[in-house]
Design a protein with these regions (language model features):
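Small-residue-enriched hydrophobic alpha-helices in membranes
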Residues: 1-140
Length: 140
């Protein structure tokens, strides 16, 4: 399970092409939430990001598909997805690429679209996140 969470966190961080210090710092929070070793978790995620840089679109899609497969418990899937949404907005911005990757992850985790949208709207408003996505959640 730890490897799947690391891969998904790497995908979210990588999705907008920018790795912010806030995102890297949030990895420690995420590891703590999931009761995982913080330093190892962060190191592996950063290594995964380097692997993602080398992938084409099809490889990236398969990477997401593999990282989301086999997580049968809905509450665990939801908990992971909630943390990934927080990770996506931790730098104060939400763009098309992050929205798109979260949509793909939610689909593969079988998280309902309404859950994704409602919770993202809440997080965006609660944290005063700047939305630069065509899927402008701040207007919902």
């Amino acid at each position: 399970m730890e490897e799947k969470i690391q891969k998904l966190a790497a995908a979210v961080i990588f999705s907008d092409g920018e790795i912010s210090p806030d995102e890297i710092q949030y990895l420690e929070v995420l590891a703590e939430k999931m009761n995982l070793d913080k330093s190892n978790f962060k190191r592996v995620v950063q290594k995964e990001i380097q692997e993602l840089i080398k992938m084409d679109d099809e490889e990236f899609h398969n990477y997401i598909k593999n990282a989301t497969s086999g997580i049968s418990d809905y509450e665990i899937r939801k908990s992971i997805f909630n943390s990934l949404m927080e990770l996506a907005i931790i730098d104060g911005l939400l763009d098309d690429l992050e929205t798109s990757i979260l949509g793909t992850i939610s689909e593969h985790l079988e998280i309902p679209l309404h859950y994704f949208v409602n919770n993202m709207v809440y997080l965006v408003k609660e944290n005063n996140v700047e939305v630069t996505s065509e899927f402008n959640l701040s207007d919902k």
